[in-house]
Amino acid sequence: STHCISSAASDVYKRQAEWDHAARFFWNTVVNHRSVCIGGNSVREHFHPSDNFTSMLNDVQGAETCNTYNMLRLTKMLYQNSGDVDNSNKPDPRYVDYYERALYNHILSSQEPDKGGFVYFTPMRPGHYRVYSQPETSMWCCVGSGLENHTKYGEFIYAHQQDTLYVNLFIPSQLNWKEQGVTLTQETLFPDDEKVTLRIDKAAKKNLTLMIRIPEWAGNSKGYEITINGKKHLSDIQTGASTYLPIRRKWKKGDMITFHLPMKVSLEQIPDKKDYYAFLYGPIVLATSTGTENLDGIYADDSRGGHIAHGRQTPLQEIPMLIGNPDSIRHSLHKLSGSKLAFSYDGNVYPTQKSKSLELIPFFRLHNSRYAVYFRQASEEQFKTIQEEMATAEQKATDLANRTVDLVFPGEQQPESDHGILYEASETGTHKDRHFRRAKGWFSYNLKVKEEASQLMITVRQEDRNLSLIHISEPTRLGMI
């Protein structure tokens, strides 16, 4: 399939320049400052501070699929009008870089391949897992958008503009470009194989330009080694930024364009520059399985919060920590032979793995398992101190989690809705990067209870500590605070 770059949607942007500026500012902020390696964003459906991704690494309610669904819709619209913004009359391939990253690593990973269930939250907490919807129990927002997500893998592969065809994504496909009388077939096993072949099955007798995308992760055009009908195509494009390589000629039936994508292993630090890193191969995020135990509720029931992975949270000190500097860590990951992507890490790892090395595969292929996408990195000198600090913090967090019957985050829409919020003359806001609800009148929640529950823990401002704040309704009265 293909789109025309001048669309009704982009016409709206042309008429509303201030909207266009706001949309691009939002896109740049989310993509470059608030997104993790899979292209997703947010914790508990809210943006955390852009300079602190701690909650993303700790919380089990990680990147929401609907957010990425909408970011891809916005990306497509901005791409279609991007040439008008800088007066280049050419679309900006940086939008395709993000689209590709989010498509392969978040969207493709959000459907369970056996039963077809959809994912609501994708935790980035190392050692946790995802929950999958079921037809009779789960009609979440991420099921509705999920039904759309997996029908749209073909919509962004190509774009056209007058007599120019843009090849954006490397996905097996056939294009019928009716306006120019061209039929083209793309053959590839990407990302398992670097080879891409474009075959002209039908062509009109006129000059047309083929624009082949050179992604940012490819480095420069030298690695492409483009051949046309077996003869090397020379190009003087040298860039580390995303761009297009133009080939203009009078195409004929049977013409074959072949190139190899220069994919390599890279190490990407979490955006707030904590010592957590993810491995990528080209644009593909890699992950390791950390076990299949205690996957409580992996297939969602119809309970409140059935979309959340409520099972045991693996203590972070039990997750593989990579010992060494980032450069040595990157060079310790090696591609294995075989038809499917797989990698072996032979560097220094703590805790020591049962097998001799750590095995990683594309995240989108890792299902029905706990996993780690981000890994803690430490030098030899930092290692012992970090272990002690993590063990102390994790013990406190684990003790609290094991004692917790229910949990609500005041001022956050979905947690409050899930807990039956009622209020009168109440307002919400944020203070020091935390959401709050203020009771000028009153507000209430419905909380789960257990007979053995004996405490209610709340967070209040220091100046409010001595006020009479909480009433617990009968028949379960824990006391007055």
Q: What is each PLM-predicted segment?
A:
Residues 225-256, 263-271:
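A surface-exposed beta-strand-loop module
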Residues 198-206, 437-439, 443-454:
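Extracellular and analogous surface-interaction loops
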Residues 2-9, 13, 470-471, 478-481:
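Single conserved hydrophobic/aromatic residue that forms the stacking wall/gate
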Residues 23, 97-105, 110, 114-199, ...:
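C-terminal beta-rich recognition modules with glycine/proline-rich loops and embedded aromatic residues
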Residues 221-230, 467-477:
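Short, surface-exposed beta-strand/strand-loop-strand elements in extracellular ectodomains
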Residues 209-216, 451-466:
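A short beta-strand element within beta-rich, extracytoplasmic domains
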Residues 1, 7-10, 40-64, 115-139:
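Carbohydrate-binding/catalytic loop surfaces
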Residues 4-16, 55-59, 70-87, 197-202:
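Well-ordered alpha-helical scaffold segments within catalytic/enzyme domains
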